Regions:
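Acidic donor-binding loop of glycosyltransferase active sites
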Residues: 198, 312-326, 337-339
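Conserved catalytic-core segment of nucleotide-activated headgroup transferases in glycan assembly
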Residues: 222-297, 301-308, 312
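Conserved acidic donor-binding segment of nucleotide-sugar-dependent glycosyltransferases
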Residues: 356-366, 373-379
């Protein structure tokens, strides 16, 4: 008889608009025929309810359990008061001097206990459906690990190590006592919480090692994420001098990485080759776009695109990520689609690519510019495309992922 597997998620991973969405979706999809699948997920304002039907077409076996946080005021008076409160809060924020410590408060917020209503919801789901295994994903809802019945085996998928990202951010503010305190607090909380799980899955062996070094004693398995790969690779190589950056600004490493590239590399590249263009794919807030366009008016923001390949084919993808952990799905996507790429060391961390063989890897802005210019060589582009694509096909297949996850669940 099949066991009952509950996925507890911060969002429904569909459509596949980000690397996180893809990693979660493929993790569910690969075991959908091996378990009775239940998916509890948060629903927030802006959620398109039609997405639920689209998801069901892809994984009809799943029982979907939305945690709808949208609230409607009971009457007109309450709605007016609610709107006034939000307007006053926004105006008060404008009048308040910027506090550089606000971002450190967000570190504390990220692993807070989930609202009582949804803790009880998850508990009731576990009892109603006799859940055998519950799998929590993404750091900002990791505290659900603490809300599960003792009869349920607890698995946590660590997409990104919070303490790694915070530690890198702290390097830019080394004398801030409050920041140091927040870092130590969140680190202790993160490690303690992870030790309450029965098993932890990381998406790279590097993250597994870092967790063990910080004192995690729960068994850890390095799994991986996958992307869809075409059976036959048809490289699309042109003389176009186009760079692409893929990723939304709600992921802080994307914001920091793009700004780092624009500040340290972009103008130097344009001085050497004025014809280069830079296109940014993914949803970005208008204020963030305008902030970048002020000093870099030639950057093109394309927003979310329905067909990523058609948008980035013929380009060189840049992955200038400087903070964070986990695995960069954008690199796996590029390799699977036949898109050559250049990356920082952090950007490619945990992915078995080698500098000069599959891509170019460097943290030196000057060398990064030189590497981009080297990729004007069509033969070198083709070499990188073929080598990286072969790596993805060999190490990131759906069946390999399925066997990996089943081995983990069998150990519980």
């Amino acid at each position: 008889m099949k066991k009952n597997l509950l996925f507890i998620l911060p969002f429904l991973p569909y459509p596949l608009v980000s690397g996180g969405h893809q990693a979660i979706f493929n993790g569910i999809d690969c075991v959908k025929d091996d378990f009775n699948i239940f998916i509890a997920f948060y629903v927030n304002w802006g959620f398109d309810d039609n997405v639920v039907d689209e998801f069901r077409k892809r994984i009809p076996q799943a029982t979907l359990l939305p945690m709808d946080t949208r609230r409607k005021a009971p009457n007109f008076k309450a709605r007016v008061i609610d709107k006034l409160q939000r307007l006053l809060a926004a105006e008060a924020k404008k009048c308040t001097p910027p506090d550089k410590n606000v971002k450190y408060d967000l570190w504390l917020w990220s692993n807070r206990p989930q609202p009582a209503e949804w803790q009880q919801f998850i508990w009731d789901v576990c009892e109603k459906y006799q859940i055998d295994i519950a799998q929590v994903e993404m750091p900002w809802i990791s505290s659900f690990i603490l809300s599960l019945p003792d009869t349920v085996k607890k698995v946590y998928v660590h997409h990104e190590l919070a303490f790694v990202k915070h530690g890198l951010e702290l390097q830019n503010d080394p004398d801030n006592l409050y920041a140091k305190t927040c870092y130590k607090h969140t680190l202790a909380s993160e490690i303690s919480m992870l030790n309450q799980a029965d098993h932890i899955i990381t998406l790279s062996p590097v993250d597994k090692r870092k967790l063990e070094e910080k004192g995690v004693t729960t068994p850890i398995t390095s799994s991986f994420a996958i992307v869809n790969t075409k059976a036959e690779l048809t490289p699309y190589i042109t003389d176009n001098q186009v760079l692409t950056f893929v990723g939304p600004d709600d992921n802080i490493p994307n914001m920091v990485g793009l700004r780092w590239f624009l500040t340290n590399c972009w103008h130097s590249l344009k001085e050497k080759e004025p014809a280069y263009k830079l296109k940014v794919i993914g949803k970005w807030r208008e204020d963030n776009k305008q902030s970048i366009l002020k000093d870099n008016p030639e950057v093109e923001f394309l927003g979310f695109v329905d067909n990523l390949y058609e948008t980035i084919k013929g380009s060189v993808m840049i992955v200038p990520i400087t903070i964070g952990s986990g695995i960069r799905m954008k690199i796996l996507e590029a390799a699977s689609m036949g898109i050559p790429f250049v990356s920082t060391i952090v950007g490619a961390e945990g992915i078995p690519v080698n500098d000069g063989h599959d891509c170019f890897l460097t943290d030196d802005p000057k060398k990064l510019v030189e590497d981009i210019l080297k990729l004007q060589d069509k033969d070198l582009k083709l070499q990188f495309i073929r080598n990286a694509n072969q790596m993805v096909k060999q190490q990131y297949s759906a069946e390999t992922l399925r066997r990996n996850r089943l081995e983990i669940y069998d150990q519980l």
